[in-house]
């Protein structure tokens, strides 16, 4: 895509500069461009706030993932039919959400287990961290904290949560997640990060990319459309929030804050993708009520 970017990537080059050609490329062949999102995140536990308060959970006692076992035991005793910790049969598993390793594109071939202090590529699956974490999660599965059908579950965690069947999940914390989660599920979350500093790894720029198909009938036009989206607040708002006046209303134009119209909630909204981090450029779109302007 380097030639297409040089010719049509006006917005892309404004955002990334010449570094756009240094990511997602092999031997100088650029196969995609990264989306514009927060790069750093911190593994954290997200718990339904109403249940944390109901069972008097002291979040100050939660310092690391293993501390959640006592919490699960307490909440499960009062909510026996509820899943304590979300997991699915794809990459959205507790283990993957807790990992701070840099898989360098594919952890199967090796990873940086301590990227801030070492550039040594190690066997991810033979690491002490992997063994300890997998053992802990297996124990939780045996105790019923993780759903017995996790290996075949294809439901998104938001669907399970909106149905009232989920207490918590491990997820990457960044400033936008509290508002994003509440607006998409209808629940407030108590969040406990497990580290003080966020991490940035290779997937931060290659986890979600946008490309022009090799067999595109008109790659030039495809590139122009892609570049346009990166610079268009109107398109970004349409993709992420839907139609103004129907799916959302602007509450604070100066700070770009929106909310549901009267009578609309997370349960009955006609459209609310609310995953700007999956789209080309969330920084130019509106922010949901409760976000830091």
Which residue stretches match the model-derived regions?
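Extracytoplasmic/secretory soluble proteins
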Residues: 1-293
């Amino acid at each position: 895509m380097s030639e297409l970017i040089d010719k049509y990537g006006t917005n892309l080059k404004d955002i990334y500069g010449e570094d756009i050609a240094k990511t997602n490329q092999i031997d100088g062949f650029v196969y995609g461009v990264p989306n514009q999102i927060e790069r750093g995140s911190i593994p954290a536990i997200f718990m339904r706030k109403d249940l944390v308060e109901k069972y008097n959970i002291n979040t100050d006692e939660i310092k690391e993932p293993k501390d959640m076992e006592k919490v699960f035991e307490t909440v499960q005793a009062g909510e026996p039919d509820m899943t304590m910790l979300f997991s699915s049969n794809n990459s959205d598993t507790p283990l993957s959400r807790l990992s701070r390793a840099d898989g360098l594109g594919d952890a199967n071939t090796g990873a940086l287990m301590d990227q801030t202090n070492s550039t040594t590529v190690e066997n991810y699956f033979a690491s002490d961290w992997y063994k300890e974490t997998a053992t802990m999660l297996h124990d939780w599965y045996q105790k019923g904290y993780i759903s017995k059908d996790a290996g075949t579950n294809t439901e998104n965690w938001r669907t399970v949560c909106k149905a009232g069947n989920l207490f918590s999940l491990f997820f990457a914390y960044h400033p936008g997640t509290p508002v994003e989660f509440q607006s998409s599920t209808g629940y407030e979350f108590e969040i406990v990060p497990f580290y003080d500093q966020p991490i940035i790894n290779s997937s931060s720029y290659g986890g979600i990319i946008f490309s022009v198909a090799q067999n595109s009938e008109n790659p030039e036009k495809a590139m122009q459309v892609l570049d346009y989206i990166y610079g268009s607040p109107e398109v970004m708002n349409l993709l992420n929030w839907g139609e103004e006046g129907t799916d959302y209303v602007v509450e604070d134009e100066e700070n770009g804050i929106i909310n549901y119209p009267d009578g609309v909630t997370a349960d009955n909204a006609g459209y609310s993708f609310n995953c700007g981090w999956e789209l080309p450029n969330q920084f130019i779109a509106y922010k949901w009520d409760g976000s830091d302007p």
